[in-house]
């Protein structure tokens, strides 16, 4: 596990995602509310490929739906497949609405260089569900079957983070589904003895983001292990 001190991520890490907060702010993924400088690439049907304005890595993209619709991945495994094969060398990921998405009211994915995520190569130290798909339809079907097998509240998507990366042949895509047991750890906060850490896909793939210098300097291996144990399921 690596740590990154990134104060620009404080907005995302500390985002309020309750209904009142979402209603009170304009959606920053809708085209009408984005800066004019944030131009879009339309290579993926139904989506806009955008440079993330608060990047974790030097190459970090957000892939936002053209429509303002809730963050949900059921029925969209084919989209993830096309994104992964359309961006070789990148890991495309999805943060569920209670699993790190700072815009749970607008469906979006993100993409970062796969080589920056240590656990993709070394393996994940907590429970994951993995499968490989060789076409978009299979990806959608297998992802939907996986989601249907997970526990969740009636009418709501299971709590998950999902990563997808194409293999060297750029045909087979590896999907890693991370079931979540909690949105944030018990230590989440800015008070004494607390840490402003809210794990999402990048954190759980081996690069934990710390917006505060205090957390970067004081988090121990045991602290990180406990944070992961509280938000993920054990092997």
Pin down the residues of each PLM region.
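Short glycine-biased active-site loop of nucleotidyltransferases that positions the nucleotide triphosphate
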Residues: 101-104
């Amino acid at each position: 596990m690596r740590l990154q001190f990134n104060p620009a991520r404080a907005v995302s890490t500390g985002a309020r995602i309750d209904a009142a907060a979402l209603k009170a702010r304009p959606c920053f993924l809708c085209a009408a509310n984005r800066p004019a400088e944030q131009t879009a690439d339309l290579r993926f049907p139904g989506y806009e490929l955008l440079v993330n304005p608060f990047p974790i890595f030097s190459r970090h993209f957000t892939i936002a739906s053209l429509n303002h619709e809730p963050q949900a991945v059921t029925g969209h495994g084919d989209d993830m497949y096309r994104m992964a094969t359309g961006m070789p060398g990148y890991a495309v990921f999805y943060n569920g609405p209670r699993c790190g998405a700072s815009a749970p009211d607008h469906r979006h994915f993100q993409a970062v260089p796969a080589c920056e995520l240590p656990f993709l190569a070394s393996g994940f130290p907590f429970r994951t569900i993995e499968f490989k798909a060789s076409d978009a339809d299979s990806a959608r079907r297998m992802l939907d079957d996986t989601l249907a097998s997970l526990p969740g509240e009636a009418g709501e998507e299971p709590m998950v983070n999902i990563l997808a990366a194409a293999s060297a042949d750029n045909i087979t895509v590896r999907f890693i589904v991370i079931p979540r047991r909690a949105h944030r750890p018990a230590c989440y906060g800015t008070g004494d003895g607390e840490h402003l850490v809210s794990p999402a896909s990048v954190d759980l793939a081996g690069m934990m983001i710390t917006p505060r210098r205090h957390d970067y300097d004081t988090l121990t291996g045991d602290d990180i292990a406990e944070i992961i144990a509280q938000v993920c399921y054990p092997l």
